[in-house]
């Protein structure tokens, strides 16, 4: 997709950051793991702050989170903190209550700090021609197997045809009122919402797929932290050239 060069509308970004991150095997939420002297959450926020059209970043944190207030970025003028919920979708819904004076809202994983500015701009420029929104995504490259279970042992059931399969990434960008209504309907009707685009799909919309870079990883497992550190070092080297 061609990234247009045009003035971008003001956008509010939401970071659901109330999760515990138990798969990281840490004693505190994974968004507060550090690379260098900054937490993953700070690195993610700073990436978004580089875009002037992002007028506000709303961070939804756990009610018992005492880490965020200790971070220097908590005093940043464009950063607002709200209390999140027990699931991602509840955190996003609570944050949406505070979105004012914009037509577009962007949702980004709190532990996805390796976002390239070029990808972010490409996503933001879909506001020129879409009335729904879209997500960053990458085509599936690896062979995908559907698992079976025999005597409590995982086995290969069959191979999934990967043509037209994409990995959903974040950020995900949608019209504010449309995202609100789709999330509300999905929750009311008991639909499991794993990301924001799933709610729009359920309501019959087809968000755009905006090709992004595969190094825009979400830190989920312990080994991801070292990989994210490497990717960020490459980003820093590129910016310093």
Swiss-Prot record:
Protein name as catalogued: 2-C-methyl-D-erythritol 4-phosphate cytidylyltransferase
Source organism of the structure: Baumannia cicadellinicola subsp. Homalodisca coagulata
Reaction catalysis annotation: 2-C-methyl-D-erythritol 4-phosphate + CTP + H(+) = 4-CDP-2-C-methyl-D-erythritol + diphosphate
Family according to the record: Belongs to the IspD/TarI cytidylyltransferase family. IspD subfamily.
Record keywords, A-Z: Isoprene biosynthesis, Nucleotidyltransferase, Transferase
Residues of the site described as Transition state stabilizer: 23, 30
Keyword Oxidoreductase: no
InterPro entries per record: IspD, IspD/TarI, IspD/TarI_cytidylyltransf_bact, ISPD_synthase_CS, Nucleotide-diphossugar_trans
Top-level EC class as recorded in UniProt: transferase
